[in-house]
Amino acid sequence: MAQMTVQVVTPDGLKYDHHASFIHAVTKDGQIGILPGHINLIAPLEVDELKVRRVDDESHVDWIAVNGGIIEVKDDFITIIANSAERDRDIDVSRAERAKQRAERVLEEETKRVLEEATKSDRNDDVQRAQIALRRALNRINVGTKIR
């Protein structure tokens, strides 16, 4: 059976290293499915889930919450470099829920302030940071609650 090697690397080191028969990722240009023999490519990733179907068991899928980064496909070797990445089994869903609630609260407060003071650009930065924090929390919750 044809296979690929998949590695997920963060500033904290190697987070994932397995052989796969299929990978699904979400890039800035949309969703991508990768099979062995895929053309070489480099693409920026969205904050989203990464699905890896393992070679050792076709029914086994590893889910990884990836917070942006890039994916490189070269000769059946897939490297994902991300600021952070967590496997579904490692995600503390209750912690992610709390992060989601904090981000939603900040977004609501900052959106009100921005509407009141539309000329302040620093408020827009706070809103953008809160939106990113919310996307990351939702991604972690989504991956952390996958049926195992």
UniProtKB/Swiss-Prot annotation:
Leader sequence residues: none
Family in the record: Belongs to the ATPase epsilon chain family.
The protein's role, per its UniProt record: Produces ATP from ADP in the presence of a proton gradient across the membrane.
Main localization of the protein described in the UniProt heading: membrane
Keywords: ATP synthesis, Cell membrane, CF(1), Hydrogen ion transport, Ion transport, Membrane, Transport
Listed InterPro entries: ATP_synth_F1_dsu/esu (IPR001469), ATP_synth_F1_dsu/esu_N (IPR020546), ATP_synth_F1_esu_C (IPR020547), ATPsynth_dsu/esu_N (IPR036771)
Source taxon at top rank: Bacteria
The keyword Transmembrane appears for this protein: no
Stored PANTHER family: ATP SYNTHASE DELTA/EPSILON CHAIN, ATP SYNTHASE EPSILON CHAIN, CHLOROPLASTIC
Any one of the GO CC terms: plasma membrane
Gene3D superfamilies named in the record: ATP synthase delta/epsilon subunit, C-terminal domain, F0F1 ATP synthase delta/epsilon subunit, N-terminal
NCBIfam families registered for this protein in UniProt: ATP_synt_epsi, PRK00571.1-3
Record localization: Cell membrane
Pfam families referenced in this protein's UniProt entry, alphabetically: ATP-synt_DE, ATP-synt_DE_N
Subunit structure, interactors included: F-type ATPases have 2 components, CF(1) - the catalytic core - and CF(0) - the membrane proton channel. CF(1) has five subunits: alpha(3), beta(3), gamma(1), delta(1), epsilon(1). CF(0) has three main subunits: a, b and c.
Protein name: ATP synthase epsilon chain
HAMAP family hit by this protein: ATP_synth_epsil_bac
One Gene Ontology molecular-function label: ATP binding
Organism encoding this protein: Streptococcus thermophilus (strain ATCC BAA-491 / LMD-9)
Membrane topology: Peripheral membrane protein
